[in-house]
C-alpha cells in the first residue's frame, strides 16, 4: 500500500512525513523544500504479531508495512506547470490513497504561501489542481474515442461515461463522489482512468498542541475541514505534526508518559496508520512459527488461495487447504496443538474468505 502526503508549502507536510518515517527528509521554511518525493516504509502497529512472537519464541517478528511518499508542495497553477507542476501530479497518480495535510494552526514564524490561514481556500487550491489534471486525462480519452464511438456501441457507452464524469468535475466535485453505473464495463473504465480525485483521501488537520486534547473540537479551522470533507466523501484526522516529530525521537515509555501529559491516549501516527488501513478496506492475516511471525496485508473479501499468493505466488497455484485459527483463540489456548484438540482450528478450502486476525497455516503442493 502506498499513500501520498500532499499539501501546500509550509503546512507541516514534510514534518509529518519525518514523524512517520524518522527519515529526516529536508524540511525548511520555504516553498518546495521537498524537490523529489521522499519515500519511507512505515510499520503498521499491531500488538497481535508481537504477542504471537512471544508465544512462539520466534527469531523474527515482521509487521505489515505502509509506504508513504512525501510529494512536493503544490501551488495554484500546478496543473498548468506552475511551481513544480505536472511532474508531481504524476507522483500522486501512483499512490493508492492521499493524505492531504491542511494547516489549522496559527504561527507568525512560519509563513503561509498565501499570507493567511484559511483551510477552505487551501483545500480548494489543491483540489482544483487535481480536478484540472483529471479533466485533462478525460479530454485525452474523449479525443481518442469520440470518432470511433459513432460506429461502436461499446465506445459510445464509454464516451457517455467519460463526459458524465467530466461534467461532474467541471461542477467542482471530486470523482470519488461520482455514482458510477452498476455494470462491469463502467466500473472497469472508471477505475482505468486512475483519476486523482477518485482516490480515497484523509485530511490531516494539522493543529497546535493545545488543540489535541479535544481533537480539534474548539478549533474553527478544523470545523471547516470537517464540513468540506463530509461534502466530498473524505475522512478527517486531527494531528499535531510538530508533537509527532518530537514523539518519534522518544522510546515507548517516554512516549506514553508524554501522551498522558498531553491528555491524549495514543499517538496520532498510530491512529493515522489505522485510519489508512480502514480507508482502503485492508485487513491483516498472520503467519506464525519459530523462524518468523509475520503480518500480511490483504483487501477485505480476499479468499484463502489469494492470501497464500501474498506470501509466494506458488502457494496460490498449488493451494490445497488452509488451517485457520482466530488469533485470540490461539493465544488463549497457548499453542496450535492445544487449539486443535479443542476443535477450534478450521481446515478451510479455496472459497474461505480470510478474516482480520486469522492465523493461517497453508497446505499446498507445487
Tell what function each PLM region has.
Residues 40-45, 72-82, 93-155, 168-182, ...:
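Conserved Switch II/interswitch segment of TRAFAC-class P-loop GTPases
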Residues 23-31, 38-40, 48-51, 80, ...:
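Glycine-rich, flexible loop/turn motifs
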Residues 22, 54, 90, 94, ...:
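Short, intrinsically disordered, mixed-charge
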Residues 1-111, 139-140, 145:
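Conserved G1/Walker A P-loop phosphate-binding module
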Residues 2-6, 17, 146-353, 360, ...:
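C-terminal-of-GTPase-core extension/linker across diverse P-loop GTPases
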Amino acid at each position: 500500500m502506498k499513500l501520498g502526503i500532499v499539501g501546500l508549502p509550509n503546512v507541516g507536510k514534510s514534518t509529518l512525513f519525518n514523524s512517520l518515517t524518522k527519515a529526516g527528509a529536508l524540511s525548511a521554511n520555504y516553498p518546495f523544500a521537498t524537490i523529489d518525493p521522499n519515500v519511507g516504509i512505515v510499520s503498521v502497529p499491531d500488538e497481535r504479531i508481537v504477542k504471537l512472537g512471544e508465544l512462539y519464541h520466534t527469531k523474527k517478528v515482521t509487521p505489515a508495512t505502509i509506504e508513504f511518499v512525501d510529494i512536493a508542495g503544490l501551488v495554484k497553477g500546478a496543473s498548468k506547470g506552475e511551481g513544480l507542476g505536472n511532474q508531481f501530479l504524476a507522483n500522486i497518480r501512483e499512490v493508492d490513497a492521499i493524505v492531504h495535510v491542511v494547516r489549522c494552526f496559527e504561527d507568525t514564524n512560519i509563513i503561509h504561501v498565501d499570507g493567511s490561514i484559511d483551510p477552505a481556500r487551501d483545500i480548494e487550491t489543491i483540489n482544483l489542481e487535481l480536478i484540472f489534471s483529471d479533466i485533462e486525462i478525460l479530454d485525452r480519452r474523449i479525443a481518442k474515442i469520440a470518432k470511433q464511438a459513432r460506429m461502436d456501441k461499446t465506445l459510445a457507452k464509454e464516451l457517455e461515461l467519460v463526459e458524465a464524469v467530466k461534467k461532474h468535475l467541471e461542477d467542482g466535485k471530486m470523482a470519488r463522489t461520482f455514482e458510477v453505473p452498476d455494470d462491469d464495463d463502467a466500473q472497469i473504465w472508471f477505475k482505468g482512468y486512475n483519476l486523482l480525485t477518485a482516490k480515497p483521501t484523509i485530511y490531516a488537520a494539522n493543529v497546535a498542541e493545545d488543540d489535541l486534547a479535544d481533537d480539534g473540537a474548539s478549533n474553527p479551522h478544523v470545523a471547516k475541514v470537517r464540513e468540506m470533507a463530509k461534502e466530498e466523501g473524505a475522512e478527517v484526522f486531527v494531528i499535531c505534526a510538530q508533537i509527532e516529530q518530537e514523539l518519534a525521537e522518544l522510546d515507548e515509555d517516554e512516549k506514553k508518559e508524554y501522551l498522558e501529559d498531553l491528555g491524549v491516549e495514543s499517538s496520532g501516527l498510530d491512529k493515522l496508520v489505522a485510519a489508512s488501513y480502514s480507508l482502503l478496506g485492508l485487513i491483516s492475516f498472520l503467519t506464525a512459527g519459530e523462524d518468523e511471525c509475520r503480518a500480511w496485508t490483504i483487501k477485505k473479501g480476499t479468499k484463502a488461495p489469494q492470501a497464500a499468493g501474498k506470501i509466494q505466488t506458488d502457494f496460490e497455484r498449488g493451494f490445497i487447504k488452509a488451517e485457520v485459527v482466530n488469533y485470540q483463540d490461539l493465544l488463549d489456548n497457548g499453542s496450535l496443538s492445544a487449539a486443535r484438540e479443542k476443535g477450534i482450528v478450521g481446515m478451510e478450502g479455496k472459497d474461505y474468505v480470510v478474516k482480520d486476525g486469522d492465523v493461517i497455516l497453508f497446505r499446498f503442493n507445487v
